[in-house]
Amino acid sequence: LGYVHTLNLSHPVSPLAGMEAILINNMIFKKEKEGHEKFLIEFNRFNEPKIFSIDGKKPRIVIDIHNVSSVRSGLSRIDVNGTLIKQIRTALDRKTNGMRIVIDVEANRNYEVDQTFYKAENIFVVDISEDIKKPAEAKPKAAKP
């Protein structure tokens, strides 16, 4: 008996296969009282994005959303008038159906970031406030030779 080997050239089944695709209906920036700034994302269904921060000279908060089928037009850049948030940029990758949202925040500040999902409304909220309990770290001085 012989064995026949065939190449499987089709795409493997994605772990997201069979799930209803994500539609992003709206994204809104809100400046609240007491130094809170909020970024709201309105979905068509429950979705828990991956969120992480990048420190450095240009600190940012990054939100990754998978299985996105469409985004309402005009949402590639969201206007902000924040004290903590400088700008919000978005990019949709049609090949992977992933969306990345980058929130650029002011440097030399300590932040507190909370995230909440309101299931009844399908709204994911990122709440950013300045952490006044601990001062921003001073940059270390260069050593003298």
Task: Pin down the residues of each PLM region.
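Short linear recognition/processing motifs and adjacent strand/loop elements at protein termini
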Residues: 1-145
